[in-house]
């Protein structure tokens, strides 16, 4: 074993090999020397462990020139940015793990400008005095939704927390038992309510809640009625929930604010494209609840944000809550949100320019044509290394939206000749950029719904790299 340890090259020898262009690989001369040295030391430590475990038993395999290819791969992998672009071939439009909604070009341009230049973030250009960051989006938000006033924080969970902390702290909030949803990451509505200082008063049964359940629960401690839209799941069969307009009428009669957590939220009706009818933000505002919260980065197709709209008397109270400062959005989110809201002033323009909307409303015929183009490109790029074809399939909206509806699509099927589809899927996670797809029927499949035409070339490159071509 000692002779194997002695056969390991020195750190300096490997550093020289890594930074010398004559070795036929990309050099790492631009990396900080201290970082490069640490990465080489880590690589050598791993080889020492291989020796101890008996995985290496030939001194010649430890020569610098033999180790260099795996060292280059190791350093390249560990020195690149950790937060990276990914090619989404899954067909899940609002993929929570892959960053949810893509921003429209107008929004990305606005973000770039906000990052690169000073701005009037909290400066009133009319008076030359300090202004409010919310003034850039509140009027737009009200115009699009029809609400009296609006506010934006950093996500919808924060919006719900802020609303409950402002209006309900120390009191009881009445909510249907069937609406106590988990919103992802193990965060649940009851947990958010507990943190706000409000006391939860559950009414009804899991599958059925009546107006009388709310009426009977109201007492001297009641401070609000809460309704949570179950956008991330559906109860079917023997089921009943109280319509929003009836709950609003009860709130008015008992002088209690009605809060609607709309979850995903949407400004468009998607029924013309085969999706089930979901309440739009505008229709919910029209029903008259006092406060409505919803997300900015799901069906809306904007940045991560929690949007709060409603009657001015309540929104003004929420704005004055000191917690609002801790939850406020930054200038990049603000820039992206304003640009996205401006697109919604013309709904058809929004449908064409907001990527999430464009992907959700793509027709089956269009997707079939694009799948055939992608398949043809992959056949040319991969040759005999894989069998490429197209098959019918389904996409999903994702992001906790439209949970019960599949979207028809055409999938591109890749069956590698030299490895299993599972191995191919794993290798594709290490390409640049990584390509994420689906495993179905022992094949690797890609959905063109979530791949832009300009991404077809890097998809082909990633597959060639993963197959060693």
From Swiss-Prot:
Pfam families per the UniProt record, alphabetical: Se-cys_synth_N (PF12390), SelA (PF03841)
Pathway: Aminoacyl-tRNA biosynthesis; selenocysteinyl-tRNA(Sec) biosynthesis; selenocysteinyl-tRNA(Sec) from L-seryl-tRNA(Sec) (bacterial route): step 1/1
Keyword presence, Transferase: yes
Top-level taxon in the UniProt lineage: Bacteria
Cofactor field: pyridoxal 5'-phosphate
EC code: 2.9.1.1
Coiled-coil ranges from the UniProt annotation: none
Function: Converts seryl-tRNA(Sec) to selenocysteinyl-tRNA(Sec) required for selenoprotein biosynthesis.
Keyword field: Cytoplasm, Protein biosynthesis, Pyridoxal phosphate, Selenium, Transferase
Protein name per its UniProtKB record: L-seryl-tRNA(Sec) selenium transferase
UniProt xrefs under NCBIfam families: selA
Gene name of this polypeptide: selA
Principal place of residence: cytoplasm
Modified residues (N6-(pyridoxal phosphate)lysine): 298
Any one GO molecular function term: L-seryl-tRNA(Sec) selenium transferase activity
Gene Ontology cellular component terms for the protein in this record: cytoplasm
């Amino acid at each position: 074993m000692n002779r194997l340890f002695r056969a390991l090259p020195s750190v300096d020898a490997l550093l020289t090999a890594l930074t010398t262009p004559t070795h036929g690989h990309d050099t790492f001369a631009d990396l900080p020397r201290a970082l490069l040295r640490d990465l080489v030391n880590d690589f050598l430590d791993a080889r020492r462990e291989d020796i101890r475990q008996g995985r290496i038993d030939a001194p010649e395999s430890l020569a610098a020139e033999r180790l260099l290819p795996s060292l280059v791969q190791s350093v390249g992998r560990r020195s690149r940015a950790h937060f990276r672009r990914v090619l989404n071939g899954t067909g899940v439009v609002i993929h929570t793990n892959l960053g949810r909604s893509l921003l429209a070009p107008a929004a990305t341009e606005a973000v770039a400008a906000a990052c690169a230049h000073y701005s009037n973030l909290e400066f009133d250009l009319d008076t030359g005095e300090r202004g409010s960051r919310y003034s850039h989006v509140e009027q737009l938000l009200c115009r699009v939704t029809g609400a009296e006033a609006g506010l934006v924080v950093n996500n919808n969970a924060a919006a719900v927390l802020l609303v409950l902390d402002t209006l309900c702290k120390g009191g009881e909030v009445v909510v249907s038992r069937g609406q106590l949803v988990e919103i992802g990451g193990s965060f649940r509505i009851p947990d958010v309510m507990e943190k706000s200082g409000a006391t939860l008063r559950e009414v009804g049964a899991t599958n059925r809640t009546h107006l009388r359940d709310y009426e009977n629960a109201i007492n001297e401690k009641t401070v609000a009625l809460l309704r949570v839209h179950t956008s991330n799941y559906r109860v079917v069969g023997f089921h009943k929930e109280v319509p929003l307009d009836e709950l609003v009428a009860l709130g008015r009669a008992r002088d209690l604010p009605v809060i609607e957590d709309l979850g995903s939220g949407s400004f468009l009706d998607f029924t013309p494209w085969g999706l089930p009818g979901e309440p739009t933000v505008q229709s919910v505002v029209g029903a008259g609840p006092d406060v409505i919260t919803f997300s900015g980065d799901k069906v809306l197709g904007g940045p991560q944000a929690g949007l709060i709209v409603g009657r001015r008397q309540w929104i003004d109270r929420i704005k004055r809550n000191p917690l609002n400062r801790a939850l406020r959005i930054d200038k990049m989110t603000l820039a992206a949100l304003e640009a996205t809201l401006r697109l919604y002033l013309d709904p058809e323009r929004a449908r064409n320019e907001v990527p999430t909307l464009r992907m959700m409303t793509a027709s089956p015929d269009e997707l079939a044509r694009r799948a055939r183009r992608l398949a043809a490109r992959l056949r040319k790029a991969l040759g005999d290394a894989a069998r490429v074809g197209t098959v019918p399939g389904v996409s999903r909206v994702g992001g906790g939206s439209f949970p019960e509806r599949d979207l028809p699509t055409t999938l591109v099927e890749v069956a590698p000749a030299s490895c299993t589809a599972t191995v191919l899927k794993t290798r594709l996670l290490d390409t640049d950029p990584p390509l994420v797809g689906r495993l179905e029927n022992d094949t690797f499949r890609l959905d063109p719904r979530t791949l832009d035409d300009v991404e077809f070339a890097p998809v082909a490159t990633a597959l060639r790299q993963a197959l060693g071509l």
